[in-house]
Amino acid sequence: MSMKRHLLIDLGAAWTRIVRVGDSRLWNEPSAVMTSADEPPRILAVGAEADAAVERPPDNIRVRRPQSEGRIAEPDLAEKQFSFWLQRHFGRIALPALYPCLTLTVPCGAMEYERKALTDMGRAARFMAVKLVDELAAHAAGLDEQVPPDEPTVVVAVGAAYAQAGVVRNGAVLTQRMIHAKNTRDGAAGNAVTEELRHWINKTFGLSVGEDQVERLKRGEAHKIVGYSVIEECFKTVEITDAQISQAVRPVLARLAELVEDVIDDGVRSVGESVRESVRRHGVFLTGGGAKLKGLADFVRETAHVPVALAAEPEETAIRGLQRLEARQ
């Protein structure tokens, strides 16, 4: 089988990244599916086309995200999403021929039934073989910084729906922790930052704002936002400083700093003092799209009292790690 017919996917709640083995191109797909509102729902669009309707979908359609909190929330939709990506990036293959091999990232805290659900989903999408790789192992392999593989590396991956941290050595995850929260604001990932900011804006200025504006504020692309004041019954514009943003999301930053401290302590207990020695030499590595939040690295450094390094392109670390792991096979 041609190696180019092997697909690597970093499956995320907000974004999914896709690479073909032997091809340097990287596809970024919003993890969104647009369906009709009737039952059973009909798929109308997948990816960017669906994501564009998230803020103001018409009454007769729904925009859904099959992946949530590191789990497949809607298996049927996820399978159709996979089939769409297959056709887009592989082209059509006449049935009943099987599609090629698939390697997927999976959260380290995933239960056996959750891993089986991912494997079953891949097979239902007609992949011949499905392999799962722990996300933290992929993130560690994707780091540009050269850490000897036999040294323990502390990796903190901050995604949209959840944050996880672990100690990785020789491609194996030795210890790991994940922050899940039923209430998004109680989490430690990108969605928690968004909700915390939105709540702070509403409490401070009495304004209701859309998710797209909060996301731009979070990424540092804008400091002025327009929101609707229910009390004054009009739209108002306010300017928000970086210092205000940092203060607003401080609860989320504190949970991430605590996660770092806990996973280092876990590593020392299970692996030994070599974990602290490696952290002193190389630092704790922040990866994932949520790691780009301004002030996060400094806050963790000052609160957890450890050196911190931000991956060069944190949102692509896991998919690049899958490429490197596959190249070693």
Describe these PLM feature segments.
Residues M1-E29, M34-R42, A48-V156, V168-V284, ...:
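Nucleotide/phosphate-binding catalytic cleft detector across ATP-hydrolyzing
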Residues G159-Y162:
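Gly/Ser-rich catalytic serine loop of serine hydrolases
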